């Protein structure tokens, strides 16, 4: 993914984007703590390698993060170390990032929405925006009328369609993958 960002943003732009992503993780943790959001926030994430070639790629990624992005925190776990953590010898190894993290995304969103409401923000659900005007007196045009506000946040996923064509040209596709289960417990996780 970073190759794509370097092509589109240049070397310095890609570094800035990486740094922003690192800062965003700290912001998430701060918001979870400040607002008491119950979203199973946990620090640490491991990219695992199924094939030896995948592990070689993770090794290169670790080096690139350290050299190009001044991010020396990732640890390459060989098969034995990863197996000890996961209880499975299925993987060749993995790249563990202790500063990254994971959470339950829906619960995080619901917690942010509640924090916004607690701060006096009005959230209009199931009210599609047809058009908006930004600036000093933002205005949103909806089917049933207009919404005036002091600040406007476009929170419509990555694809806003005709609502914000200027933003559509600036969106870069990024894949995210989430699986959420109830907590398994130690015995069940090891089985």
Go through each PLM region and give its residues.
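Alpha-helical segment that forms one wall of the substrate-binding/catalytic cleft
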Residues: 19-27
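Alpha-helix capping and helix-loop boundary segments enriched in small/acidic/polar residues
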Residues: 12-15, 100-103, 167
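Long, contiguous hydrophobic alpha-helical segments, chiefly transmembrane helices and signal peptides
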Residues: 1, 21, 46, 103, ...
């Amino acid at each position: 993914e970073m190759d794509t960002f370097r092509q589109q943003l240049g070397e310095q732009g890609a570094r800035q984007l990486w740094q922003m992503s690192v800062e965003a993780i700290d912001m998430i943790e701060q918001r979870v703590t400040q607002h008491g959001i119950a979203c199973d926030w946990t620090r640490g994430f491991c990219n695992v390698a199924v094939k030896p070639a995948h592990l070689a790629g993770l090794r290169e990624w670790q080096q690139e993060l350290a050299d190009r992005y001044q991010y020396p925190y990732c640890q390459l776990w060989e098969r034995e170390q990863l197996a000890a953590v996961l209880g499975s010898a299925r993987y060749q190894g993995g790249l563990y990032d202790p500063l990254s993290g994971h959470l339950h995304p829906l619960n995080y969103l619901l917690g942010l929405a509640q924090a916004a409401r607690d701060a006096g923000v009005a959230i209009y659900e199931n009210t599609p925006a047809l058009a908006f005007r930004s600036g000093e007196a933002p205005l949103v045009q909806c089917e049933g009328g207009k919404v005036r506000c002091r600040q406007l946040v476009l929170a419509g996923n990555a694809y806003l369609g005709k609502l914000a064509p200027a933003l559509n040209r600036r969106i870069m596709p990024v894949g995210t993958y989430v699986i959420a289960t109830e907590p398994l417990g130690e015995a069940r996780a090891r089985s």
